[in-house]
Each structure stands twice: as C-alpha cells, then as structure tokens.
From Swiss-Prot:
A cellular component annotation (GO) from this entry: cytosol
Reactions mediated catalytically: 7-aminomethyl-7-carbaguanine + 2 NADP(+) = 7-cyano-7-deazaguanine + 2 NADPH + 3 H(+)
Name this protein carries in UniProt: NADPH-dependent 7-cyano-7-deazaguanine reductase
Subcellular location: Cytoplasm
InterPro entries: GTP-CH-I_C/QueF, NADPH_dep_7-cyano-7-deazaG_red, QueF, QueF_type1
PANTHER family registered for this protein in UniProt: NADPH-DEPENDENT 7-CYANO-7-DEAZAGUANINE REDUCTASE (PTHR34354:SF1)
Record organism: Synechocystis sp. (strain ATCC 27184 / PCC 6803 / Kazusa)
UniProt record similarity statement: Belongs to the GTP cyclohydrolase I family. QueF type 1 subfamily.
Pfam families from the UniProt entry: QueF
Binding site for substrate: V72, E73, L74, H91, E92
Amino acid sequence: MTETTITTSDNVEKYGEREIRDAQLITFPNPRPGRRYDVHITLPEFTCKCPFSGYPDFATLYLTYCPDQKVVELKSIKLYINSYRDRHIPHEEVTNQILDDFVAVANPLYARLKADFNPRGNVHTVIEVEYHQEKAS
C-alpha cells in the first residue's frame, strides 16, 4: 500500500478559499417558466462576525423563492454564503444584503429570507425580509 503525504503551507491560498473569495451567484434558465412553484433552500452553516465584538455569529438561513425566468445554481449560493464568514456585519444588514444580491441576479417573482441566529448572551435573533416583483402596468 502506498502512503500519501499531504503538506500544507499557511501562506498558500487553498482552493476552497479561492472559490469562496471569487464566489458569485450564478443562475440558469428556469426549466418551467410558465408554472409557479416555490424553491426552498436551507443553509444551516452560515457564519459572519459581530461588528462590535468580533465574535462569530452562527445562523441557519431559510430562503424561499418563486422563480420567474431564472433559477439560482445551488453550489454558487453555498459559496456566496460562505464568503460572509470573515465579514464584520450586523444581523439586520447581512440578511438584507443577501436578499438584495439574490434578487439582483435571480429576479424572482417572490423571495423571502429568514436568518435564524444562534442565541448568544441569552439573546436569540431572527431576521425576516421579503421581496415581491413589481407587476408591469
């Protein structure tokens, strides 16, 4: 049996770090644009940092949307969400920013994002934001 040795260097960017750094939300054409349906995505490992203390904040994100012409590619949303890991950002801002970025690329008929942050210091925070596409007159 051959032994494999893996060496790492602290100053070399890892491929996962590069993917996260370059992450962008990617969409593809909705395979059923004439049918209204909901997509539910759960992201249980969201992290960012408190802008005041620097402590990590952990949350489960629940994204529900009704696609119009585009659907978001799942790996891209995973990498995009992971890009917040080292950012110092308040719960309210990060929840709104994620929904704004999602809407900008996917242009859904409807989207709702719920960010359920783990309790810290006996405080449990849940932020919910929504978007509804305006109808053309």
